């Protein structure tokens, strides 16, 4: 990450509790590294790339009725460390309001539930009268709101990722060599053990 390489964390095939713990521990380690560098070695922190953490099923981690996680802190206070949160969710109404307000750029796709549409339109500037428009969006269509620069809903098209990859077949992205699978597996086991310890303490 410190070299600007996009990293994907695949946590499929394990229990929901393990997925939750690993996701929180991984994000916490990376975000707090940026914070520590900012506090203790500012010149080296300036060399770090801006970090965007993309969180799938974000409502599971940002629900106000569940225990607070590192992702709330990232959205609310980590911007000054150049760490941002990209919260992906089909249930926006289950996102903590304070966090939702800090997500300035929103890409809104078709939303069936009236509860979620109401939450979006009531709590997103310049989207007050877009309930029907959100309901009528087709597959791959979205509305873009980006405060404070864009002060109206901009229609946009979302690429179908398999087609995107097909168009770039054979492109050499010159990625840095990956670590050995055995080394990554050992680190995953350590994170898993840390998650078990955290669960016992709670």
Regions found by a protein language model. Name each.
Residues 21, 138-202:
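Conserved P-loop NTPase motor module
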Residues 15-18, 66, 112, 176, ...:
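Catalytic cores of large soluble enzymes that bind and process phosphate-bearing ligands
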Residues 74-155:
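Conserved ATP-driven motor cores of ASCE-family P-loop NTPases powering translocation/secretion/packaging/pilus
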Residues 24-27, 124-125, 160-161:
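Short, solvent-exposed amphipathic alpha-helical segments in soluble enzyme
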Residues 32-36, 77-80, 110-114, 131-136, ...:
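Glycine-rich loops and low-complexity Gly/Arg-rich segments
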Residues 1-76, 142-148:
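P-loop NTPase motor domains
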Residues 11, 111, 158:
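Active-site donor-binding loop signature of nucleotide-sugar glycosyltransferases
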Residues 37, 51-54, 60-70, 106, ...:
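Accessory regions of macromolecular translocation/handling assemblies
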